[in-house]
């Protein structure tokens, strides 16, 4: 299996302080990055942690309390200013959709990348993202607002057989089945 890294950029603080930042984590797997929540100060923490901006494939927002999403519009704006062209998917509670539309229309309407919002059902567990190497599914959470956690599962890979390590002592025949 490939390395599966989690960068904790912020946790445990509703307000940014000198020692703590609001919620944001980046899961890194197979040269791709996925952000969970984007609290205020996330960009600064990404730079401190040497987490690159150009590999973020998707952003998953758990709920729309400010400490989990106030850094989002700044992040999206920075992606545009840095010349991003790759589409970006944002997953979050349906209540985030209208807020995101207003912010994007006001601040980010002339960037060269597409932003796709995917409303997640915070009341049931479901796969919301899937590619060749992993799936991401929601986990309903109890909170004052609609809220979901995100479970990242790496898909199993087939073992790689190195022909140079296989020693066959007798001649073999090849059979074709039609």
Spans of features found by a protein language model:
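Generic preference for hydrophobic
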Residues: 6-8, 90, 117, 136-138, ...
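Alpha-helix N-cap/helix-start and coil->helix boundary motif
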Residues: 43, 53, 66, 96-97, ...
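Hydrophobic packing residues within well-ordered alpha-helices of enzyme cores
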Residues: 46, 72, 100-103, 177-178
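Metallo-beta-lactamase
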Residues: 93-147, 155-158
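Alpha/beta-hydrolase-fold enzymes
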Residues: 158-164
């Amino acid at each position: 299996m490939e390395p599966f890294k989690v960068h904790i950029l912020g946790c445990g603080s509703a307000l940014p302080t000198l020692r703590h930042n609001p919620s944001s984590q980046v899961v890194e797997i197979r040269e791709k990055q996925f952000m969970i929540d984007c609290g205020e100060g996330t960009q600064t923490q990404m730079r401190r942690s040497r987490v690159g901006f150009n590999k973020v494939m998707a952003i998953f927002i758990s709920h729309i309390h400010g400490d989990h999403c106030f850094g989002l519009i700044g992040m999206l704006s920075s992606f545009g200013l840095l010349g991003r062209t790759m589409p970006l998917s944002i997953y979050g509670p349906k209540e985030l959709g209208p807020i995101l539309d207003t912010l994007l229309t006001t601040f980010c309407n002339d960037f060269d990348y597409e932003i796709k919002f995917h409303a997640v059902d915070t009341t049931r567990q479901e796969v919301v993202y899937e590619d060749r190497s992993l799936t991401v599914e929601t986990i309903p959470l109890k909170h004052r607002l609609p809220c979901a956690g995100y479970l990242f599962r790496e898909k199993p890979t087939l073992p790689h057989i190195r022909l140079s390590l296989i020693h066959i002592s007798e001649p073999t025949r090849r059979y074709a089945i039609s």
